[in-house]
UniProtKB/Swiss-Prot annotation:
GO-annotated cellular components: cytosol; Swr1 complex
Protein name from the UniProt record: SWR1-complex protein 5
Keyword Transcription regulation: yes
UniProt keywords, alphabetically: Activator, Chromatin regulator, Nucleus, Transcription, Transcription regulation
Main localisation: nucleus
Length: 286
């Protein structure tokens, strides 16, 4: 606590304050500031400076030297940026010092062998293509006929004409569907006058019956006939005509007949062996 004293004669203007050091608490003082250093610290700091023990200037002047510190792999310790720059420089210099080496004789022989095999394959491919082209040309040179189909579709008469091979299933179906063979119309004869001049007889429209007999009018296709033609077109497109002929109904019946004959022959052979076995056993018993 601060104990005020009575003013003396020598100091009448100012009052002297005496501090009770034992009972004084600094935190209870109104002017206490915890952020400021204490007076005792200031006094110690001043005493250190005065005695020469304070070496702050020397510590600030001292600088750490990392140039002699080495990593476990050897060399100076580098930062991330230095390592990145070093890596980029190594990548750039990687191809600058690359030297082309001569190709060995073994590699040259393998390359020549591969070239020969490639040329041989190209030659074989060209030969196959040439043979296929000749076969297709021969097929095109085969006799072709024009077939015409007329049928109602969606309420409209549709007429279709196309060239097909005479040996194709579609052509055979079309020829079988024709009820009348086409006949050439006889051209109108010309008459000569006594004077030697030729006159043309005016043409008239022939009757429909004569056109049908002559084959000028094609019969309309029924739904069944159109289905047959569509099936024949599909067979020619897929190329299964020979396969169908091999596995048709007649072929199946022929196979069944052959199997029955084989079974009959096997039964006859079994009966003959059985009869011989019985005769042999009877002779031994007698």
């Amino acid at each position: 606590m601060i104990a005020p004293t009575e003013p003396t004669e020598g100091n009448s203007r100012a009052s002297v304050l005496e501090f009770d050091e034992e009972g004084y608490v600094e935190s209870e003082d109104e002017d206490f500031d915890p952020s400021k250093p204490a007076d005792d610290d200031k006094e110690e700091e001043l005493s250190d400076k005065s005695d020469g023990d304070y070496q702050e200037a020397d510590e600030e002047a001292e600088k750490y030297d990392y140039s002699h510190i080495e990593s476990s792999e050897g060399g100076l310790v580098s930062t991330r940026n230095a390592r990145r720059l070093q890596h980029e420089r190594e990548q750039r210099e990687k191809y600058e010092h690359f030297e082309m080496q001569g190709v060995s004789s073994r590699a040259g022989e393998l390359w020549a062998q591969l070239q020969e095999e490639s040329q041989a394959r190209l030659h074989d491919t060209s030969s196959v293509m040439h043979a296929g082209g000749e076969a297709g040309k021969d097929r095109m040179q085969e006799e072709q006929i024009m077939i015409e189909r007329a049928y109602w579709f969606a309420g409209e008469m549709v007429r279709e004409k196309k060239m097909v091979l005479k040996s194709s299933a579609e052509a055979q179906e079309y020829l079988n569907s024709l009820k009348f063979k086409p006949k050439e119309l006889v051209p109108s004869t010309m008459q000569e006058m006594d004077g030697g001049s030729k006159l043309r007889r005016p043409l008239k429209r022939p009757p429909i019956l004569e056109q049908i007999i002559a084959g000028a009018l094609k019969p309309k296709l029924t739904t069944l006939e159109k289905s047959k033609l569509d099936w024949a077109t599909y067979v020619d497109k897929e190329g299964i005509n020979e396969e169908l002929q091999l596995f048709n109904k007649d072929g199946y019946l022929a196979k069944q007949d052959f199997l029955r004959k084989v079974d009959g022959i096997q039964n006859e052979q079994y009966k003959e062996l059985r009869r011989q076995e019985l005769q042999k056993n009877g002779a031994q018993g007698m």
